[in-house]
Amino acid sequence: MSDRVSVTIGIPFRNARRSLATAVRSVFAQTHHDWELLLIDDGSTDGSIEAVRRLEDPRVRLVGDGSHRGLCARLNQIAAMARGTYLARMDADDVMHPERVERQLALLQTDPSVDLVDTAIYTMDDDLTPLGVRGDRPLDCRPESVLRDGLLIHPTVMGRAEWFRRHPYDPVFVRAEDRELWIRTCTTTRFARLDRPLFFYREGPGGNLENYLRTERTLRDILRRYGPPLVGTRRTRLLVMRSRLKSIAYRLGTRLGQQARLISRRNRRLEAAEVREARSILAAIQGTPVPGLDNDAPAPSVERRLPGEAAA
């Protein structure tokens, strides 16, 4: 395999056996074929590695050291190991639209001033049923908006691999590492968005209260660090108070059994035609043959780099 490809698709995973194969299948369904798939295990114990060890394609690298180091460390590892000029993010429980890489790559190549581009998303449940659309409005890159609302939809982000190497994720900000990265770089980075949903984001019906509260606590730490120089002390205090009120509202909503409703408010409801289109795309992805996962698919060699195994 050549040492250089146009795009590295990086998927960090931990205990994702139930969803990982579908995520991988969506990579093989891409209309752009000059990619490498970098699968980084973060100490799985559920057989996730065994589920993808069967992959037989020279564009795939499966890497694991047996340890649990956390998402930030694995994302930085992906950037360090990427052979591609461009790097596309993805999580192990999500699914890419077949045109995702092609369309993001076209934008980045057409306009070299753009550093990072994300896309709108379909949200879906655990059964891959489309639920709604999010992120189909233009980006607001003003510092206060970035502090208040975030910016990019993290698993859909694609950019030059060198950008990610220059701007690593900070492991101090667990569960909000993406928000910290966008805020840290918002005055020196140009962001863009494709407002067509090119990604399927898996979203549980109720979420997790403790995770949500932990995220908001981390966001308040980020606001205190970056807010004053960007928007001033007074505006920062208001943003911190807003975060506290959101935590109170979410805690109350959980007690009242309204978690699903709170989550659904983030989405735009799908029209009937959009539901049909989304289902058709997902069906096509699920029917995409993958060497090694499907007995009748072509089976070239795969590079594996796991403890005790030499690279192919």
Question: What kind of feature is each model-predicted range?
Answer:
Residues D65-A82, R103:
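Glycine-rich, basic loop-to-helix element that forms the pyrophosphate-binding segment
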Residues R18-A21, D46-R54, V95, E99:
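Acidic helix N-cap motif at the loop->helix transition within catalytic regions
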Residues L87:
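Short aromatic/hydrophobic "clamp" motif used to bind/position activated sugar donors
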Residues M1-F28:
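N-proximal low-complexity "stem/linker" segments adjacent to membrane-targeting elements
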